[in-house]
C-alpha cells in the first residue's frame, strides 16, 4: 500500500477524530465559558460539549478494496468479470491484500495469464448468503412480513475476515435483501418501524446499538457497513432511531446515546467554524447572507467500488467534465439515498451532469433540524440548560432558514437551493414533505404543500418521487416506501388526514396486489400503472426483492389504517378519510407496540 493511498484514505477519519478530540478538550477546558447561542454556526465545538473521540478501533482494515489492490481492482471491474460491480467489492481476499497485489503484478506478465482464474484462486464469495425461503401464497401479507424478518436477519459478524470489505457489527441486524447483504443507514430506520409493529423491540435496540458502535469506531455512520462506504454517510436518521427506542424504554435512552448524537452532529457540521459567507466545506454551506445550511458530500473523488465500471464509463462518455468532480458527485449521490434522480442533475435529465455538491437539499436540513432538537432534549433531560438552549436556538434558526430559503413560490412547495448559482432548482419532488414530517413548515406552507402534492404527485399507486421520467430509479413513475411514510406522517401532523389516508391506501393496494401476484414485496413500484402492483424499473441494478424498508413501512401503514387489513382483495381497500378504530384490525395485524407520532412541535 502506497503512502498516498494511506493519506487519501485517512483524511475523513483523521479529521473527524481530531474534531471530536478538540471538542472533548474544549469541553474540559471551557466548561464554564459562555456559549455562542446565535445559531449562525459559530462555536460548534462549544455547542456539543463533552464529545470524546471515537472509542473503538476498527476490527478490520478500514480501507476499501479499490485502494488495497488498485490495479487489480480496476482490471477486474473493467474486464466485467461479474455482471454486478458490487460482487468483486464484496469478495473476501484469501491472503493479505498486499501479497495478492504483488502476486498479480508478477502473474499478469506471464503467458496464458487468466484474470478470472487469478481471482478464483485469491478471493472467495462471502459466506453470508441469504437464507433459503419460498413464500407461501396462502399466507396473508402481515404474516409474510413477520416471517421475512428472520429471513433478512443477520447474526453478529464475529468471524469476519480482517481483509473483508465488511465492517463487522456486534449485534444482530436486518439487511434490505438480495444484493444488499449489509446494513444500510437510512433504510434501517424504516425497517425498525416495522420491527416494532412485529413485536421485535429487542432487535430494534440491537439495530440502534450497531449504529452507535459505528459512530464510536469511525466518528460517523457510514452509508453501510462496508469499507467502501466509509467516505460518506446517508440521510441522518439516528436521532429518529433514538426517539423510537425511547418511546418504549423511556427518556433515559436520550442520555445513553448523547455521546453518539453529539458525534453525529459534529460529523455533519465539521468545517462550519469560521467558514466565510458564500463558501462550502465538506457537508456545510454558508450562503452569501451568512445563513448556515448543509449539503451532501463524499470525501473521495474516485469511482465507487460498488459501481466502479459504471462510473468509469460515465466519465469516458463525458470527456469535457473533470472526472474527479464527476466521481465525487456520483458518490455524494449515494449519500443522498436518492441515487439517482433528475433532482441532482444540472440539466435535469442526464446522469453525467450530476451536481449534488452544489445543492442545499430540503430533506437533509430538515433531518438536521430534528437532530438539533433531539440534542436539545437530551441536554435538558441531563439538566444542562445552557447547551439545551443553544441547540434549540440552532434548530429554530435552521427551521427559519428552511422556511425562507427552501420555499419555492413557483412550485408552491419546498425545494432545493443551488448555492453556486444562488437560485432554487425549481424541481418538484416528494422531498417537499420533509418539512411537514419534521414539523418545520408553517401551517400555511403545509396546507399549500398538501394541495401541490395532491395535484402534482399523487398517482393511482401512491406518491410519485418526481414529475420527471428520466429512466433513473428515483424519478417518475417510481414510488418508494420511505417517501410514502414520510408523507403520511407529515400530512397527519398538519391535519390533512384525508390526503394522508389516500396516499397510504393507494400504496397499500400497490404492495398487496404485487404480493398476491408474485408472493414478493420489492424495493420500489411503478405508481403510475393503471393496474396496481406493477414493479418499477430504472437504476444501476435489477429490481431487488426482500425488501427491508418496503416491509417496514407496509407493516406500519397496516396498523395506522387497520381497515385495509380486512380487505381480501386490493380492490376492496377503502380510500378516503373515514375513521376506523384499531379494534377493527385483524389479530394478525394488531400492533405489538403503539407507534407514536414525533413530539416535534408544529410551527404556526
Give residue spans per PLM region.
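N-terminal signal peptide c-region/cleavage motif recognized by signal peptidases
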Residues: 24-28
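Intrinsically disordered, low-structural-confidence terminal and linker regions
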Residues: 30-107
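Terminal, non-catalytic domain-edge segments
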Residues: 34-47, 547-587, 592-597, 602-604
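Extended glycan-interaction surfaces of carbohydrate-active proteins
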Residues: 72-182, 206-212, 218-221, 225, ...
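Extended, well-ordered alpha-helical scaffold segments
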Residues: 144, 200-211, 252-269, 371, ...
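Alpha-helical support elements that line or immediately flank enzyme active sites
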Residues: 184-211, 431-443, 484-497
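Aromatic/His-enriched, Gly/Pro-containing loop or helix-boundary segments
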Residues: 215-257
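Long, repeat-rich segments with strong aromatic
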Residues: 355-384, 391, 476-486, 490-494, ...
Amino acid at each position: 500500500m502506497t503512502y498516498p493511498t494511506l493519506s487519501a484514505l485517512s483524511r475523513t477519519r483523521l479529521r473527524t477524530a481530531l474534531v471530536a478530540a478538540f471538542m472533548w478538550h474544549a469541553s474540559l477546558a471551557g466548561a464554564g465559558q459562555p456559549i455562542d447561542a446565535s445559531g449562525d454556526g459559530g462555536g460548534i465545538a462549544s455547542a456539543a460539549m463533552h464529545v470524546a473521540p471515537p472509542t473503538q478501533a476498527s476490527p478490520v482494515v478500514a480501507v476499501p478494496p479499490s485502494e488495497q489492490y488498485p490495479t487489480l481492482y480496476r482490471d477486474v471491474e473493467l474486464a466485467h468479470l461479474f455482471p454486478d460491480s458490487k460482487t468483486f467489492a464484496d469478495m473476501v481476499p484469501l491472503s493479505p491484500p498486499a501479497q495478492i497485489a504483488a502476486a498479480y503484478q508478477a502473474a499478469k506478465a506471464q503467458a496464458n495469464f487468466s484474470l478470472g482464474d487469478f481471482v478464483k484462486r485469491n478471493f472467495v464469495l462471502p459466506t453470508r448468503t441469504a437464507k433459503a425461503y419460498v413464500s407461501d401464497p396462502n399466507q396473508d401479507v402481515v404474516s409474510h412480513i413477520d416471517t421475512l424478518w428472520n429471513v433478512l436477519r443477520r447474526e453478529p459478524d464475529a468471524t469476519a475476515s480482517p481483509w473483508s470489505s465488511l465492517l463487522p457489527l456486534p449485534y444482530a441486524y436486518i439487511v434490505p435483501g438480495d444484493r444488499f447483504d449489509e446494513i444500510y443507514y437510512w433504510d434501517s430506520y424504516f425497517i425498525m418501524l416495522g420491527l416494532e409493529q412485529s413485536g421485535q423491540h429487542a432487535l430494534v435496540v440491537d439495530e440502534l446499538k450497531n449504529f452507535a458502535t459505528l459512530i464510536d469506531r469511525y466518528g460517523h455512520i457510514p452509508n453501510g457497513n462496508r469499507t467502501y462506504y466509509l467516505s460518506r454517510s446517508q440521510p441522518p436518521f439516528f436521532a429518529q432511531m433514538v426517539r423510537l427506542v425511547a418511546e418504549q424504554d423511556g427518556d433515559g435512552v436520550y442520555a445513553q446515546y448523547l455521546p453518539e448524537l453529539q458525534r453525529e452532529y459534529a460529523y455533519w457540521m465539521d468545517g462550519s467554524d469560521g467558514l466565510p459567507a458564500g463558501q462550502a466545506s465538506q457537508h456545510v454551506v454558508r450562503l452569501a447572507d451568512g445563513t448556515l445550511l448543509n449539503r451532501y458530500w463524499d470525501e473521495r473523488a474516485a469511482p465507487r467500488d460498488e459501481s466502479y465500471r459504471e462510473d468509469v464509463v460515465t466519465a469516458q462518455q463525458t470527456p469535457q467534465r473533470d472526472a474527479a468532480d464527476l466521481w465525487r458527485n456520483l458518490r455524494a449521490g449515494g449519500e443522498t439515498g436518492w441515487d439517482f434522480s433528475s433532482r441532482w442533475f444540472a440539466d435535469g435529465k442526464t446522469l453525467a451532469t450530476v451536481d449534488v455538491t452544489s445543492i442545499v437539499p430540503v430533506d437533509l436540513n430538515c433531518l438536521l433540524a430534528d437532530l438539533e432538537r433531539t440534542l436539545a432534549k437530551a441536554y435538558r433531560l441531563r439538566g444542562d440548560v445552557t447547551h439545551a438552549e443553544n441547540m434549540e436556538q440552532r434548530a429554530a434558526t435552521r427551521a427559519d432558514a428552511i422556511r425562507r430559503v427552501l420555499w419555492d413560490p413557483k412550485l408552491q412547495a419546498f425545494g432545493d437551493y443551488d448555492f453556486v448559482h444562488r437560485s432554487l432548482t425549481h424541481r418538484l419532488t416528494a422531498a417537499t414533505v420533509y418539512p411537514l414530517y419534521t414539523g418545520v413548515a408553517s401551517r400555511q406552507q403545509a396546507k399549500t404543500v398538501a394541495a401541490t402534492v395532491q395535484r402534482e404527485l399523487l398517482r393511482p399507486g401512491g406518491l410519485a418521487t418526481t414529475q420527471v421520467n428520466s429512466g433513473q430509479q428515483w424519478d417518475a413513475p417510481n414510488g418508494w416506501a420511505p417517501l410514502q411514510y414520510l408523507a403520511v406522517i407529515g400530512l397527519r401532523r398538519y391535519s390533512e388526514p384525508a390526503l394522508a389516508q389516500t396516499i397510504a391506501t393507494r400504496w397499500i393496494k400497490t404492495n398487496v396486489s404485487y404480493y398476491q401476484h408474485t408472493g414478493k414485496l420489492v424495493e420500489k413500484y411503478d405508481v403510475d400503472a393503471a393496474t396496481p402492483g406493477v414493479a418499477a424499473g430504472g437504476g444501476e441494478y435489477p429490481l431487488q426483492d426482500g425488501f427491508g424498508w418496503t416491509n417496514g413501512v407496509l407493516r406500519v401503514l397496516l396498523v395506522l389504517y387497520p381497515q385495509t387489513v380486512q380487505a381480501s382483495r386490493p380492490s376492496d381497500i377503502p380510500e378516503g378519510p373515514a375513521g376506523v378504530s384499531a379494534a377493527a384490525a385483524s389479530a394478525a395485524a394488531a400492533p405489538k407496540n403503539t407507534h407514536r407520532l414525533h413530539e416535534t412541535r408544529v410551527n404556526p
